[in-house]
């Protein structure tokens, strides 16, 4: 890297709030509310991004809950609610949640900012407990 390129990175500052919250297994609404409350506190402290643990919205391990359509509907509604909350210009959210894409389920991280889902990244290397 040239000195000019290094200087460009030296001036970049991002404040990340780690959401070390205890999600309730299967209680999507409560987990969403916890995250929204934490986002308010993080915004007051100047955070740019909030990062949650893997599968935060569902709780971990979600096991067979992710096979229920009504549960996945609640997950999708919570992601939409969280995304809309980011329209206020406050911190972006990176939230871990299960994702239903047609008939396939993923363990994903959603990047929410500016009132929408900006990106989704699916976990590639899943644990093998067998």
Model regions and ranges:
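Hydrophobic structural segments
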Residues: 1-130
């Amino acid at each position: 890297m040239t000195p000019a390129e290094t200087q460009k990175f030296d001036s970049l500052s991002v404040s990340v709030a780690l959401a070390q919250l205890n999600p309730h297994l299967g209680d999507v609404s409560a987990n969403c509310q916890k995250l929204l409350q934490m986002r308010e506190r993080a915004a007051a402290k100047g955070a740019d991004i909030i990062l949650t643990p893997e599968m935060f919205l569902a709780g971990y391990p979600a096991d067979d809950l992710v096979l229920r359509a009504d549960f996945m509907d609640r997950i999708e509604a919570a992601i939409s609610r969280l995304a809309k909350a980011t329209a206020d210009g406050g911190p972006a959210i990176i939230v871990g949640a299960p994702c239903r894409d047609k008939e396939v389920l993923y363990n994903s991280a959603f990047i929410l900012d500016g009132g929408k889902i900006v990106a989704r990244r699916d976990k590639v290397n899943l644990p093998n407990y067998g």
